[in-house]
Regions:
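Short histidine-centered catalytic/ligand-binding loop motif
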Residues: 19-22, 71-78, 192-193
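Active-site nucleotide-donor binding segment shared across nucleotidyl transfer reactions
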Residues: 37-70, 74-76
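Metal-dependent nucleotidyltransferase catalytic core
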Residues: 74-108
């Protein structure tokens, strides 16, 4: 169980100094996210842990980003409410079910808010909350592993609990379907509000997962399985190629800084700016996002053409072909050769897969 001292002002301030994170609100949210995960692990709830916070366990410190929600997958018919006991022992005051179904779509989800008393401000009556998103589906991951709930943000007392998480290859396939705002991914707007921050979170995660894969066999199967389910929920044709194109087009618009669609680029740029507090021990600017976009486009192209080997940038561009002879190559990408050579490398690879 997570130690009660993790919910104190002293602990939050200690972690702020230790990890170099100014936003104590985010630190406290991360701590409570892990506490909710620990509660679920103790409860016997049948679930697989997915989403951004799961990467803090799968990738460890390599993720360098804060995630403050819990996303899980439960078998259809699971009554999640029966597992939400012992809230006070896990640092929570209460929870509220927000909705059982996503408006306008047939996605079998539930959303709950878990409220806790804010410690870092030293105020007794200030509350905040974290979200639990539950997707009611059978597990579609090919490889699942059990990992301990362990992080530099928390300390535990007694035995550390285990949770089931997807492999790097599986969750990369999942994340790629989420970085497709016009089809299966996080849309530009939800209920009239910009979701660009969530889009950039998917992009950032793809960039970190990219470094852990050399073969896309597992990713390809996970992508196809998840993509077909998501297309079905949205009433779209069961043609995964529209997702590949969506990923590439979104990535290209970002890399060309809005040359294709200035309004959508402005949204993505705003998402990058709002994402900055969520990374630590590193920085994340438009140039970093362009590199990650080039990786996403390259991966989408490899999957589309059923090429499983991933080539990685070594710092050498001398082996790349002359792009003047390549059909459909956007000449504006040539600027990246000097300004952002890593992004240029992956864009060349994306346009020369076949």
């Amino acid at each position: 169980m997570i130690s009660a001292k993790c919910f104190t002002q002293e602990w939050v301030e200690e972690k702020s100094i230790e990890l170099g994170i100014r936003d104590k609100n985010l630190i406290e949210k991360v701590i409570h996210a892990f506490s909710l995960l620990d509660l679920l692990a103790q409860s016997g709830c049948p679930f697989h842990f997915k989403g951004g916070t799961s990467l803090m366990l799968i990738l460890g410190k390599a993720t360098n980003r804060l995630s403050i929600d819990i996303d899980i997958m439960c078998p259809p018919g699971t009554q999640i409410e029966q597992y939400l006991n012992n809230l006070s022992q896990n640092g929570f005051l209460r929870y509220e079910m927000v909705e059982r179904k996503q408006a306008g779509k047939n996605v079998p989800k539930s959303h709950s808010k878990f409220f806790y008393q804010v410690a870092y401000k030293g105020a007794k009556d200030v509350e905040s909350f974290i979200l639990l998103d539950v997707l009611y589906e059978d597990c579609h991951y090919e490889q699942v592993q059990e990992v301990e709930i362990d992080s530099s943000f928390i300390t535990t007392e007694g035995k550390k609990h285990l949770v089931k998480v997807p492999s790097v290859g599986d969750i990369l396939g999942d994340k790629l379907t989420a970085f497709a705002p016009e089809t299966t991914g996080v849309p530009y707007f939800k209920k009239g509000k910009s979701s660009s921050l969530e889009i950039i979170k998917q992009l950032y995660d793809i960039g970190r997962l990219f470094e852990r894969v050399d073969d896309l066999a597992i990713t390809a199967r996970a992508f196809k399985s998840i993509a077909e389910i998501e297309l079905g929920y949205r009433g779209l044709p069961l043609d995964v190629s529209i997702i590949y194109d969506d990923i590439r087009n979104t990535a290209l618009n970002l890399s060309l800084r809005g040359f294709i669609d200035q309004d959508k680029f402005a949204l993505l740029q705003d998402g990058i700016n709002r994402f900055k507090p969520f990374v630590y021990n590193t920085s994340y600017y438009i140039e970093n996002a362009i590199v990650d976009a080039s990786k996403a486009a390259y991966l989408a192209t490899l999957l589309k053409h059923k090429v499983m080997k991933v080539e990685k940038y070594s710092g050498d561009l001398s082996s790349l072909p002359d792009m003047a002879t390549v059909n459909d190559w956007p000449n504006k990408l040539n600027k990246l050769k000097k300004l952002n050579p890593e992004a240029y490398f992956y864009w060349v690879k994306a346009f020369t897969v076949v």
